A protein has these predicted regions:
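A detector for small-residue-rich transmembrane helices and their helix-helix packing motifs
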Residues: 1-167
Length: 167
């Protein structure tokens, strides 16, 4: 799990990655996996496997780092874990991509994603024990990476005119 004294003082930097694979209970794990199953494949199809993995891991590690620094600055000694920062990164990247595609990508639209992100952040703020800094920073990291990594597919119009004398 992510615990800033272990990361900073004991130099256990691997915790920034491994904490994204640790969950605090079956409902925590199932909630994250359901969200990831619903939206993750859309982002993978839009970006490809490698870029998707970059977004997921960078948002996971980045949000863990931001959360650890935030806890250290507030002098809090909380333990953090779960894939939520990485998943919020997927949501952020997907939102940018959907917006770039005029608000629609496959079965998703920008309104759905903004409502999901808004309600999730609201739930986190209203609930105890939620790492809101990881959620928000994961979303921002994902949105930035989505903007950097995504390139819209451009379809060239086929030339339907035939030159005289050709088949």
């Amino acid at each position: 799990a992510s615990f800033w004294p272990a990361i900073i003082e004991e130099h256990e930097y691997y915790r920034l990655l491994t904490c994204t694979f640790i969950h605090f209970g079956i409902s925590h794990l199932l909630n994250n996996m359901l969200v990831l199953a619903y939206i993750g494949d859309n982002l993978e199809r839009a970006l490809g496997k490698i870029k998707y993995l970059i977004v997921y891991l960078a948002a996971g590690v980045g949000s863990s780092a931001v959360s650890a620094v935030w806890s250290m600055m507030k002098d809090e000694y909380s333990v953090s874990g779960g894939a939520s920062g990485a998943i919020f990164g997927v949501v952020g990247a997907l939102l940018v991509i959907v917006i770039r595609n005029r608000g629609q990508l496959e079965d998703l639209n920008s309104r759905q994603l903004m409502l999901f992100a808004g309600f999730s952040i609201y739930h986190g703020v209203m609930s105890a024990g939620i790492d809101n800094m990881a959620h928000i920073s994961g979303f921002v990291i994902g949105a930035l990476l989505g903007g950097l990594l995504y390139r819209r597919k451009r379809y060239r119009k086929q030339n339907t005119k035939r030159a005289a004398g050709t088949w």
